[in-house]
Amino acid sequence: MRHIHLQVFGRVQGVGFRYFTQRIAMNYNIVGTVQNVDDYVEIYAQGDDADIERFIQGVIEGASPASNVTSHQLEELELNQKLSDFRSI
């Protein structure tokens, strides 16, 4: 089980990025949150190792057809608490 913090930069706000991120999370049984912050999108996610890898790849390759990810920062976090769903906040 992994817990990650992912910041995604580029054209990721106002293009349905959070909605598509939620759909990707549901496809891979990922729990956590996605939210707009300043000029990027912030994601906290938990899931099995292989599912997290596929989730990250899906998000970075463009969760939304109108998005354009230019860079991202990934941080591994300790698994202090188990989340129960994936929400856009």
Swiss-Prot record:
Keyword Hydrolase: yes
Positions of the catalytic residues: 18, 36
Top-level enzyme category: hydrolase
EC number in record: 3.6.1.7
Gene Ontology molecular function, alphabetical: acylphosphatase activity
PROSITE patterns per UniProt: ACYLPHOSPHATASE_1, ACYLPHOSPHATASE_3
Keywords noted in UniProt: Hydrolase
Domain spans labelled Acylphosphatase-like: 3-89
InterPro entries on file: Acylphosphatase-like_dom, Acylphosphatase-like_dom_sf, Acylphosphatase_CS, Carbamoyltrans_HypF-like
Catalyzed reactions per annotation: an acyl phosphate + H2O = a carboxylate + phosphate + H(+)
NCBIfam families named among the record's database cross-references: PRK14431.1
Entry similarity comment: Belongs to the acylphosphatase family.
Official protein name in the record: Acylphosphatase
